[in-house]
């Protein structure tokens, strides 16, 4: 604690926490502060990556746009290939000559399709390479920022449990969270681009334009469940940080080369092992409860989504049966339905990952805001 019972780090952490609504009328204020807090943390992470190297953000933007457009392009090419093949079959059945395969429309479409496949693989490999290189650079930059900050902070702060816990958490999260959040953010952008493309495709389906908004609407319960339980998971891990430290302490003691002799000499191995099991039991019980409840809700929403998908597939098949659309169109529209469902699900999970990651980055933000309070009597030589 600071002078007069003042704990600067705890106060800073409290400032980052959005107060829950006191009434229904207070909900808009709560949502506005929640969104502002989320984007504030996200912008902080983007700034960290930009300081590391502007080329990282520029590369990720380009890759995310290509990754979003390519699946839609692939679906359109597949549709054209199937429709072209259907036309060939119809001409054969009518006894009409279709000419040589080489130089035909089918052959040309296949060339474009395999060029697309090659380009898609190149984009995926480029994405992996940029992510790996950027991860190393960002980790180094954030670690250096923490080291510089640790040099400036008062020595007395290191004796405060609240401060040391934040320092430990910030140092641990620095290795993964910033680049993970950035990758997830641009992954969400690419999925959003794909989603818009698939919605446009379904909007062109005769008499089926309304299926796209329905598919998006039935995904809203999944989004609410996912975001709600990500927040609960974060709060649970925050409350149980003491348990995780104890488990790390007991497990590290058992494999510490400097302590193993004393542990054997005083017969403490079973004691530490039992203590680890006991602490893990309390930690695991609450975590399991959260996981089970979340997945029960997800199973219910998945069953509802599957039933609606089956109905839409049958409606599109009926259009083919009536001769209103072709086989390639059936492949395109059903693929768009499936892709919308999977893309929305992935978009929700990725967005929840970004949201959860920005919550954990509070540890780093709070630590970096800590100010020295002891004024030196002389200048540093």
Predicted features and spans:
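Membrane-integrated ABC transporters
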Residues: 1-71, 88-109, 123, 127-131, ...
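Juxtamembrane helix-loop junctions of ABC transporter transmembrane domains
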Residues: 74-78, 115-159, 163, 229-238, ...
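An intracellular "coupling" helix at the cytosolic face of ABC transporter transmembrane type-1 domains
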Residues: 51, 169-181, 235, 239-242, ...
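Short intracellular "coupling" helices and adjacent cytoplasmic loop segments at the cytosolic face
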Residues: 21-30, 145-176, 240-275, 350, ...
